[in-house]
A protein has these predicted regions:
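Glycine-rich repeat segments that build the extracellular carbohydrate-interaction surface of secreted
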Residues: 16-20, 41-56, 76-79
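Ankyrin repeat structural motif
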Residues: 118-122
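Leucine-rich repeat
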Residues: 36, 68-69
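Glycine-centered low-complexity coil/loop motifs and glycine-rich tracts
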Residues: 53-63, 69-74, 81-113, 123-198, ...
Length: 216
């Protein structure tokens, strides 16, 4: 239920929400519109509490686990006693015989804020974490020819170093022959943010738990 309260000489709608079971892709604006009759344009004062043992997760790296893109002037208090976790990126495809590995996919963000003043209280044992970036694919390897010099040694070997970042799902190829060309592994994907600010955000962060990733 939305209740009007006076704040700074203005009427501001207020409500409290408790999340008591695991949820994916929680959208605060949609939740308020669908369940509380909020019109989506008036500023609102809302407190959201995530219970201990509850996980808010994202279904894809292109979505966030907890989204609060609100009307300007909104005040949010987010009490997290559980886990808010972004989606991890996929590993890059390993290279073929004549190519390097592909880069890993960037991880998704855990929380996204827009147009609000927010206080985040992350309790002891609670977690807010962006999704980890996927490992880069391992580089391929190509053997070329079997040239031998007068002393019986192979010549002409060429090696290309692996790319930056971990190679999570890929394994570098190996080849035999006199000249072996090893192609670089792909770069690891970037980690998602714990908290992303789109625009118009004033944030106070009180952290007694774990936060993995950037917070703005």
């Amino acid at each position: 239920m939305l209740m009007p309260v006076a704040q700074g000489g203005h009427q501001l709608l207020t409500t409290q929400i408790t999340i008591s079971s695991n949820t994916q892709d929680f959208d605060l604006q949609a939740h308020l519109t669908n369940n509380f009759g909020w019109n989506g344009s008036d500023a609102i004062d809302v407190t959201v509490t995530i219970n201990s043992g509850v996980t808010i997760s994202a279904s894809a790296v292109t979505t966030v686990a907890f989204k609060a893109h609100m009307a300007s002037g909104t005040v949010l208090t987010l009490n997290n006693n559980g886990q808010i976790i972004g989606k991890g990126g996929s590993g890059g495809t390993g290279g073929g015989g004549t190519s390097g590995g592909q880069s890993g996919q960037a991880g998704g963000h855990a929380v996204s804020f827009q147009d609000l003043t927010v206080t985040v209280n992350n309790a002891a044992l609670a977690l807010i974490g962006g999704g980890g970036g996927g490992g880069g694919g391992g580089g391929g390897s190509q053997a070329v020819g079997s040239a031998v010099d007068s002393e019986g040694d192979c010549t002409g070997g060429t090696n290309f170093g692996a790319g930056d970042g971990g190679r999570g799902q890929g394994t570098d190829g190996s080849g035999s022959g006199c000249k072996v060309v090893n192609y670089g592994g792909g770069a690891g994907g970037a980690a998602g943010k714990a908290i992303r600010h789109v625009s118009g955000v004033s944030q106070t962060l009180n952290n007694s738990g774990t936060i993995s990733g950037a917070t703005s």
